[in-house]
């Protein structure tokens, strides 16, 4: 059973992007927390300004939050009791392999290999089309004693950093990961739910970004809210089909990390994926949008998701349409017409079978 009355934890958040910073801010309101940045200049700026001026400008960070650019210092901050420590990874998918290899090397030297580790990245690895848990397994294998999981859900970093309400899901096969994350974050403005469905939680977080790009394109074309609702609903079916083929549970996609995250990312004004889609629908070129500094995980992982699905024999028509528009020069309205021209089919439980 999950409980929230555990003694104070010591928490190291590795990665000072928007989401790592937001979670560090939330955790530091309850427990001693250190945020690790890759560069000394960024760590110094965070410490002096008490603000992440690059990723979360205008959001004041709690006075108790500490900063460092030294990974050894960040791990030493955890102390010597792995049962009273937690590592939160705020690095992107592309950085997962290297940071896990570092932890697999450094934690045993401190007698801290049992420290719970949870990652927060969403998406597929570009070259391999692997989900984060698959990257971890390939990097460190079943390292004796290491307990890992994923933290995900419908959340914009800025709102979490500001202390606004949010509900998240932690998924792991290890109960101590679920206990640690719940103790670290649950309470006040953050509600934490537990799951054991790691692939399902990761799939929801990955594919919702692609579907959000599609919804943005639809909105940019002024196709109306009916069209957006159709894309969200059919996108959920797409996500579920794909997830089942990777061993996920269907009911996971009706929860926070499936439907919840999809609705937020497809409709929210802070959604970068939706924003890219809006610009595409309005006629701008992808290269111009990306050159302006906008980043969107849905753009980065769309082709990897489609390739992985094809290898499993899973049909992803919306994802395929997004790839055609983003990378093959297909006009947005042409892609919409192709989706509308697909054969009629029955909706229901058979619709999501892999």
From Swiss-Prot:
Is the keyword Metal-binding assigned to this protein? no
- What's in the keyword line of the UniProt record? Cytoplasm, Lipid biosynthesis, Lipid metabolism, NAD, NADP, Nucleotide-binding, Oxidoreductase, Phospholipid biosynthesis, Phospholipid metabolism
Domain of life, per lineage: Bacteria
EC number(s) stated in the UniProt entry for this protein: 1.1.1.94
* Swiss-Prot/TrEMBL catalytic activity: sn-glycerol 3-phosphate + NAD(+) = dihydroxyacetone phosphate + NADH + H(+); sn-glycerol 3-phosphate + NADP(+) = dihydroxyacetone phosphate + NADPH + H(+)
| Keyword NAD in record | yes
Active site, per annotation = 208
* Gene Ontology CC terms, in alphabetical order: cytosol
Chief place of localization: cytoplasm
Gene3D superfamilies in the cross-refs: N-(1-d-carboxylethyl)-l-norvaline Dehydrogenase, domain 2, NAD(P)-binding Rossmann-like Domain
Instruction: List localization entries.
Output: Cytoplasm
Looking at the Swiss-Prot or TrEMBL record, what is one Pfam family this protein matches? NAD_Gly3P_dh_C
Q: Which PROSITE patterns match?
A: NAD_G3PDH
Recorded hits in InterPro entries, A to Z, give: 6-PGluconate_DH-like_C_sf, 6PGD_dom2, G3P_DH_NAD-dep, G3P_DH_NAD-dep_C, G3P_DH_NAD-dep_N, NAD(P)-bd_dom_sf
Q: In which pathway does it act?
A: Membrane lipid metabolism; glycerophospholipid metabolism
MF terms (GO), sorted A to Z: glycerol-3-phosphate dehydrogenase [NAD(P)+] activity; NAD binding
Q: Output the HAMAP family linked to this UniProt entry.
A: NAD_Glyc3P_dehydrog
PANTHER family (UniProt xref):
GLYCEROL-3-PHOSPHATE DEHYDROGENASE, GLYCEROL-3-PHOSPHATE DEHYDROGENASE [NAD(+)] 2, CHLOROPLASTIC
| Entry function | Catalyzes the reduction of the glycolytic intermediate dihydroxyacetone phosphate (DHAP) to sn-glycerol 3-phosphate (G3P), the key precursor for phospholipid synthesis.
Protein family according to the UniProt entry: Belongs to the NAD-dependent glycerol-3-phosphate dehydrogenase family.
**Protein name as catalogued:** Glycerol-3-phosphate dehydrogenase [NAD(P)+]
State the organism named in the record: Bordetella avium (strain 197N)
Q: Tell me the organism's taxonomic lineage.
A: Bacteria, Pseudomonadati, Pseudomonadota, Betaproteobacteria, Burkholderiales
